[in-house]
């Protein structure tokens, strides 16, 4: 949502500068090199790099070791229970479609294989997102794509996003998730890379805004699902209706959110 947001996530999914990477042959060669040692700690967070496929570890290392810009976003809170948050992360096309129907953004997403999605944030950034590793608290994504903007020319590049997720309770006692992301991006454009010192602050700021906006959009979606479930369901079933399995998923999600809200006692002001 990271889709969308990552899509947004996301979603966001989430929406970061990225692009056509090095060939598989080159990366396979790197996998055999002792210099391919992807670090496990990123901005104070430790990830289980030893569980990442060696070939993927080297593809990520090529970016992390030679990045154009690196940045941290978060923690950003999303008002969804842990299991539902993970389920939406696994469904970037559905999250993007909901965001569009509810007029929260212009995200688009399509599945392109197992753990692989195409995404477009409607604001000049588009590309492929590949899930490399996941567990209950962590995800690692590889991205490749392009960005066109008013102040930046057409640029392509690749990126690695380390996502850390922590279940929390909000101020009302509701289940929520805190998401923190560390992104490493590397430009492909040789001319831009030559003036990277001048561009780095602007590019880094753009990436952080894209990632942050993706997660914040998913949070806005979660608020609508809690506060206006009838509207969300109407948009899902309004022609052209979502596929039956997605309608069933949204109905179940809305019921779960409604039930969890009912379990929280209402606050009464002190006399």
Question: Could you tell me what each predicted segment is?
Answer:
Residues 31-113:
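Hydrophobic ligand-binding cavity/cleft-lining segments
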Residues 89, 100-102, 121-123, 133-135, ...:
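A mature extracytoplasmic/lumenal domain signature
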Residues 34-53, 162-271:
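Terminal "cap-and-tail" regions of soluble proteins that handle hydrophobic small molecules
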Residues 95-118, 238-254:
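Short solvent-exposed beta->alpha transition segments
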Residues 26-28:
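N-terminal signal peptide c-region/cleavage motif recognized by signal peptidases
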Residues 108-160:
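Glycine-rich portal/gate segments that line the openings of hydrophobic small-molecule binding cavities
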Residues 75-83, 89, 153, 201-212:
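Soluble non-cytosolic domains of exported or imported proteins
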